[in-house]
Amino acid sequence: MQKVTGDIYNQINNEIYNLEGDKWWRPDFSLNLIKTLYNPFRVGYSIEVFERFKIIPGKTSVLEVGCGGGILSEEIARKGFITTGIDPSELSLKSAASHARESNLVINYEKGTGENLPFEDNSFNVVLCCDVLEHVQDLPKVISEISRVLKIGGIFIYDTFNRTYFSKISAIKILQEWKRWSIMPPKLHVWQMFIKPDEIKSLLHENHLDWKEHRGIKPNISYLKMLRYLRKRAAGKLTYEEFGKKFLMVKSRSTQIMYIGYAVK
């Protein structure tokens, strides 16, 4: 897999993560879905992997690449892990640092990109990268950098979207384009930047990361019921926070839309 061309990368709206004001933690803003809908699944999966490898929180350093407003980083820090978050957006980092202080959490936030991580080799026991890989222009470089900063035996946990017909309909058409159900900003995701499982497996192998598994991600309700909730959210009858609490994301045997996985250095 190669670096995304400029004409495709320029279509994506990454500026949503760089808006004025504390958007990340507001119940009436789309980014709140990370907290209410996706975080419980991501944290639960990560803890399962940690337990599998008998990882001890107080002695384990975790880096979140693309931490945004710190929603996932805070959950990891609450578990007792030594937590660092990195993001290219100064405004997101400002929001993250402010909320961490209010929550009495010690988290090290730094500005930077996944393509050029400002850390020494072999710095972290764990790297997390959730809903980020499909936003970067140079995915091979990001994976290379993640491998570089991971300690030997370290774990890389990630989730992303598969590039399939089903993901195009659900994540692009329904969530972003078709007004009856769309609840996400236009161009939040660009389908051509979605990543097939075999593509990321190949990149992991090239960068000395031993791929272990992929698990699909799906809602724990029927898609018909989810469409009803989407319609209510699109019509303003539910806040993003209320929508995100209507159902859970769970593991699936199908990786056709979203998937999560990990690799070991």
Regions found by a protein language model. Give the residues of each.
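Class I SAM-dependent methyltransferase SAM/SAH-binding core
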Residues: 69-116
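Conserved class I S-adenosyl-L-methionine
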Residues: 155-180
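Acceptor-substrate binding/catalytic loop of class I
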Residues: 160, 180-199
